Amino acid sequence: AASDVYKRQATHGEPSENNAHPHASDDGNVVAVHNGIIENYQELKDKLVRKGYTFYSETDTEVAVKLIDYYYKKYEGTPVDAINHALVRIRGSYALAIMFRDYPEEIYVARKDSPMILGVANGESYIGSDVPAILKYTRDVYYIGNQEMARVRKGEITFYNLDGEEIEKELKTVEWDAEAAEKSGYEHFMIKEIHEQPKAVLDTLNSVIKDGMIDLSEVGLSEEEIKEISRIYIVACGSAYHVGVAAQYVMEDLARIPVRVELASEFRYRNPILDPKGLVVIISQSGETADSLAALRESKKQGVKTLGIVNVIGSSIAREADNVYYTLAGPEIAVATTKAYSTQLIAAYTLAIQFAKIRGQITEEQYAGYIEELQSIPEKIQRIIEDKERLQWFASKQVNAKDIFFIGRGIDYAISLEGSLKMKEISYIHSEAYAAGELKHGTISLIEEGTLVIGVLTQPELYEKTLSNMVECKSRGAYLMGLTTFGHYNIEENADFSVYIPKTDPHFATSLAVIPLQLLGYYVSVAKGLDVDKPRNLAKSVTVE
């Protein structure tokens, strides 16, 4: 059997039955699935409409299928001839798997700038986008080159170039070294850890949600203590600080407790005035971050209650804090955090929801609704990760960027901060995050022809405001990328490139919107040939001051 391990996220047209793969020609003679983006699909579609083809979906894939069908019928040649004729006319990226009714025992594949791997074992053939997809079936693989195609039969694969000439390929055996085995076949720890986020988030949720209710008994905060909290101080460094910025909006809005977020390296040196009934929340993946640990000790010295949100069990912050919320991200190896960050967000959300309920700020119905929405986050993150080829394509165009600006308001500003850090720390491209309303106070003078500006628009009431800021940037020559939720398609009137995430409660948007920005930073770094997992001059756990 030939097996195609396949899942795809919507790129052209939103997710729907009509837009779902596989796509077929009008008479069902040709069917295909496709990863990638066909840049000139509208032009090809118009040509096919003139030739009498009708279209039932909004996808670029349907265009590819019907183009292949057109040349198959026009020249009455082989599938290889038809695919060749079609592919030389397609601009963009693709990994295609195609079947013809006349050749039921064969699958034809082709790739350009989108990942694909072929495997064989025991008279069977496998098609996948990367090694981990087929590893449980076989270790014997062919690496199909860029702008090459292949005919896949049971246990037999023949390769061709785009002129239709047969080419030889060497069968390779995948042999992981110890480190690669830890990476489970992924090229870098960072992309592995991005893929582990749905599980890490789910594990963290399951650790505190019991029978549809949030249970903080293992964290250690009692209901009486929660009712007495007068204000919250969130203290952290780096990405954990960005979690704090997002948490501030969520906690203040839901629990109606004043929140201050501060960098640990600033907090510890300013002789802070802390409310005796306050709660100091220290966020740290390693639990050893020097400045955060010093901030914790300063808070305890003043007699203020402390809560550590940490990933490493038994770490210094975990041992010394009065209460500990463990994020269950598992070991994180890449210097640039992804899954630890995502689990820290979940910790902040669950604290905010529980505080809001105990303090009578939300109804039982709202409480249940928020918990239900949180439980849908892992699956929504998974859907975004499956759309990674589209971001890979966009990232490849940004390798020569000199400056990138991320803009947003409210929670979208918190998302921008993390997106900007991911970009600069691993791709070494100068990037800044700005509250969108601050652009007019000087920043906009930095926008030049071609400067990439990424607008984050997940908050419905702030959408129009941020969009108008993006338009201001465009009028000064900026190249715009918009990051928003499905449904806001009018962004395409102004943005040069748009990324859509599933809808969620706006309080929790950071968990979804950060994923495309992690992928963007990762793929720009890969395209530049950099050491993604160990960026220059950075360490995983910052134990120095």
What residues fall within each predicted segment?
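Glycine-rich oxoanion-binding loops at beta->alpha junctions
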Residues: K7-N18, V208-E224, A247-I283, T289, ...
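Conserved short alpha-helical segments that host acidic/polar catalytic motifs at enzyme active sites
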Residues: A1-K183, E187-H188, K199-S230, Y269, ...
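Short, glycine-/Ser/Thr-/acidic-enriched flexible segments
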Residues: Q9-H12, G28, I37-E39, R101-P104, ...
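Active-site phosphate/pyrophosphate-binding segments
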Residues: Q197-V201, L205-Y233, N323-L452, S525-E545
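Generic C-terminus detector
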Residues: G164, Y479, N494, T504-E545
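Conserved phosphate/anionic-ligand binding catalytic regions in large, soluble enzymes, centered on
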Residues: N35-E39, V109-L118, Y186-M190, V201, ...
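Glycine-rich phosphate-binding loops that contact phosphosugars or nucleotide phosphates
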Residues: K227-G369, E373-S376, V456-P502, L520, ...
